[in-house]
């Protein structure tokens, strides 16, 4: 039956791509249709290889370029966003407002034929259960390179802990090394 994909990030567009290949179903899309996309491969190398070579993943979040990257909308990588959105069976419907019984309400219309809903709005952190932990406006722990305001509590692998690469397998090692040094120094002081 007809489907609805909610969410315009990498996962949302990848799922939209896969399920809209079957032209016999209408797929409604509720997400950002203005997002930029980048190819997964460029000149025979992965985009992540290029990011590493040019230092893109190493910019500090405190540098002017790090601040600019961090405040920008992140592109969708490896998915032809414009191509998917031009398929005849894909209908962009704007923001999803509500649902009741078989009706889904969007900004400018109501659809009653949707049988499947895929919610791909991303991951949201939940650190509220850690008493005394200071959180930023996005719900992530306030920290300096993984060191929190609570003595002995550290974080690793969070987005933009220190660099763009902090949440990637290739970039986490710098943060891990820093945290290891902090912990060794603290243990030696005590």
What label would you give each PLM region?
Residues 1-190:
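Flavin (primarily FAD) cofactor-binding/catalytic cores of flavoenzymes
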């Amino acid at each position: 039956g007809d489907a609805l994909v909610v969410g315009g990030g990498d996962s949302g567009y990848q799922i939209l791509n896969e399920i809209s290949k079957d032209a016999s179903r209408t797929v409604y899309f509720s997400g950002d249709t203005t997002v930029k996309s980048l190819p997964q491969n460029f000149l025979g190398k992965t985009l992540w290889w290029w990011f590493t070579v040019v230092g893109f993943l190493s910019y500090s979040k405190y540098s002017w370029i790090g601040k600019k990257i961090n405040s920008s909308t992140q592109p969708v990588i490896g998915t032809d966003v414009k191509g998917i959105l031009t398929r005849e069976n894909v209908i962009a419907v704007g923001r999803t407002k509500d649902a009741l019984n078989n009706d889904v309400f969007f900004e400018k219309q109501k659809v009653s034929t949707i049988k499947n809903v895929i919610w791909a709005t991303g991951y949201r952190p939940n650190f509220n259960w850690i008493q005394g932990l200071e959180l930023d406006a996005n719900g992530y722990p306030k920290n300096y390179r993984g060191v929190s305001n609570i003595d002995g509590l550290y974080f690793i692998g969070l987005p933009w802990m220190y660099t763009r690469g902090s949440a990637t397998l290739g970039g986490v090692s710098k943060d891990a090394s820093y945290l290891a040094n902090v912990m060794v120094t603290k243990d030696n002081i005590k």
